[in-house]
Amino acid sequence: QQADASASAFHTIVRDVALELSPLIAERALDFSLQAEPLTLPAHEWMLRELTRNLLHNAVRHTPPGGPLCITLARVGDQARLTVADGGPGVEPDLAKRLFQPFHSGAGGSGFGLGLAICHEITQALGGSIQLHNRRQNGRIVGLDAIVTLPLS
C-alpha cells in the first residue's frame, strides 16, 4: 500500500487536523500545545490524516475539561515520532493491548472502538508501530501517551 504513495508533509497534516478539531479543543478549554518538526513521509496523505485525527479525537474525548493535551512530531533517527499526550485517566495494561482490536473501547465505553484499531492498521501498513503508555507522576497516572513511530523513507 505504501509503495505507490507520494510524499506527504506530515507536519502540515498534523497542524490541519488540530485546526479541524480546534472547536472541540476550545469547547473543553484544554491546555493545548503543538510542536511539529517539518517532516515528509512516503505515505498517502489520507492515511496520515486518518491516523492523526483518530489519535487526537481520542485524546480530546478522554482529557478532562481544562486538562493538558500536547502533540509533538519529531525526527528520531531515521523515523518520525508522533506523540499525542493527553491528561486523561490512562488505561489498564491488559486493556491497552485490546484497544487495538476492533470494537474494544476504553473507560466510559463511548464510541464503537474502531479508532485505535484503524490507527494500528495504518501504522502497520506504513511499516511503523503504535504504543500506549500511561504517564505517571508521584506514583499516580496523570495521562496517556499515544506514540506512533513511522519510517521516514
Where do the language-model regions lie?
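Short beta-strand/loop element within the Bergerat-fold HATPase_c
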Residues: G66-D78
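Short conserved segment of the HATPase_c
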Residues: V91-F103
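Short alpha-helical Gxxx[C/S/T] motif in the catalytic ATP-binding
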Residues: G115, C119
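Short conserved segments within the C-terminal catalytic ATPase subdomain
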Residues: L24-S33
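Short helix-loop "hinge" at the ATP-lid/N-box region of the Bergerat-fold HATPase_c
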Residues: A59-V60
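Acidic ATP/Mg2+-coordinating residue in the GHKL
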Residues: D86
